[in-house]
């Protein structure tokens, strides 16, 4: 006996073409999630092109609202971060930046040993979760140094800030480049060991010295 009010009408089965369309839609949505958004088309998506010092410099110039006096490839941090690290050095008058991406390591420069720096803290800067490390001024010896670091799966991206006298925590100092801009730079997904072809091509337009600057090994 059929219970009162029970609607025995069966739901129509989905035909094969409909199932095919649904499968395509699901596949596209999954691809969009993996690529961090559809319709990017602006060269920001990660790729498999090895990043170059010139490409790193091009990315840095998008975040730093200053005109560099000099740009050079840099290997000054390679002894600490490894031969697979890639870096660019940009000089802006009283401040210079060394921007590096390297395979993950236990280097003290990425705060693997937090006692290496005077301070090594994880902080949110303008919505970007980064690690900030610094060594303070030693009068008549060393002006100090600041590092802003993004530790990711498989790699570390960081920027070393040289030039200003570090007399306090970086949040309380004028570094020459806003801390928020430095944080946005190191978390930029294009700043990776491998990046997209458009980013590499963008770097081809950068006037960069290949010999490297005369830097002193850091941080001391």
Identify the residue ranges that each predicted region occupies.
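Short, non-transmembrane alpha-helical segments in secretory-pathway proteins
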Residues: 47-70, 179-192
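Secretory-pathway extracellular proteins and peptide precursors enriched for disulfide-bonded cysteines
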Residues: 28-31, 97-115, 178, 204, ...
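Bacterial signal peptide processing site
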Residues: 39-41
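Short, solvent-exposed recognition patches
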Residues: 70-144
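C-terminal motif of bacterial Sec signal peptides marking the signal peptidase cleavage site
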Residues: 35-37
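Short, charged N-terminal extramembrane segments
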Residues: 2-8
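N-terminal export and membrane-targeting signals
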Residues: 9-28
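Extracellularly exposed regions in secreted/surface proteins, prominently low-complexity, repeat-rich
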Residues: 141-144, 151-220
């Amino acid at each position: 006996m059929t219970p009162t009010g029970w609607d025995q009408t069966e739901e129509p089965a989905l035909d094969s073409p409909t199932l095919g369309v649904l499968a395509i839609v699901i596949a596209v949505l999954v691809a969009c999630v993996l690529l961090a958004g559809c319709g990017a088309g602006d060269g920001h998506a990660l790729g498999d092109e090895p990043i170059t010092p010139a490409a790193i410099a091009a990315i840095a110039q998008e975040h730093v609202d200053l005109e560099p006096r000099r740009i050079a490839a840099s290997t000054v941090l390679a002894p600490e971060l490894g031969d697979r690290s890639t870096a660019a050095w940009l000089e802006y008058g009283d401040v210079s930046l060394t921007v590096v991406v390297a395979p993950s390591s236990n280097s003290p420069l990425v705060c693997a040993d937090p006692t290496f720096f005077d301070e090594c803290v994880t902080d949110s800067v303008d919505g970007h979760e980064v690690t900030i490390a610094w060594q303070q001024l030693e009068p008549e010896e060393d002006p100090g140094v600041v590092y802003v670091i993004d530790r990711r799966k498989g790699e570390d991206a960081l920027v070393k800030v040289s030039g200003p006298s570090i007399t306090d925590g970086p949040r309380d100092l004028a570094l020459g480049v806003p801390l928020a801009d430095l944080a946005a730079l190191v978390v930029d997904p294009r700043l990776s060991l491998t990046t997209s072809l458009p980013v590499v091509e963008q770097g081809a337009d950068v006037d960069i010295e290949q010999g490297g600057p005369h830097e002193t090994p850091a941080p001391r």
